[in-house]
Amino acid sequence: MLLWFLSGSLLLFGTFDVWYFLRGLWVALRCCFQSPIRDVLAEQVVHGRVLLHDMDFMCHMNNARYLRECDFARFAHGTRIGLFMAARALKATMVVGATTIRYRRSLALGEGFELRTRIVSWDEKSFYLEQRFVSKSDGFISAVMLCRQNVIRGSPQNILEFLCKRKVDCPDISEDLQHWIRFISASSQALRAESGLDDKTK
């Protein structure tokens, strides 16, 4: 029996990213026991620490881990403000359409950090979120990420009005976010032209 259990565990851990799903389940359960956040524009903070399985060859948190941590933080953010439930009620779904991360200073093994997530703006198709890794030792912003969360079969404004039961004013789009949105649009147009999609839609 023990041999079967060990063999099954080895097969499971060898073929699936088990820790990812366990972490996701833990985040979901924790959100169930935390009080909901009514302010959809409020910044949410989750706390983390660089552990052994986060390391790269230089004993820093590896680049991929930043994106993984952002995934879980966005999930917690959307769950606690009720964004996902509102989207589901309206039969809409949300998917990540683009991310850009800028690394400013590495996070070392054992270093604690805060991951701060907030909605910075939205348009007719997408939410735009900013996520910051802030070192607990000195408050330095070690990395900052912008994320475009596309809404399918719905719109951000409709979701927010359904959630808040009132009109929610969209914050002004900052200059750096405008540049980033233009970059995404230009990249999309270039890729469509490269694949011949523009010709097919004319």
From Swiss-Prot:
Q: Chief location of this protein?
A: secreted
First and last residue of the signal peptide: 1-24
Where is the protein found, in the record's own terms? Answer: Secreted
In terms of InterPro entries, this protein maps to: HotDog_dom_sf (IPR029069), THEM6_lcsJ_thioesterase (IPR051490)
Domain of life, per UniProt, equals Eukaryota
Q: Which Gene3D superfamilies match?
A: Hotdog Thioesterase
One GO cellular component term of this record is:
extracellular region
Keywords assigned: Secreted, Signal
Q: Which family does it belong to?
A: Belongs to the THEM6 family.
Protein name listed in UniProt: Protein THEM6
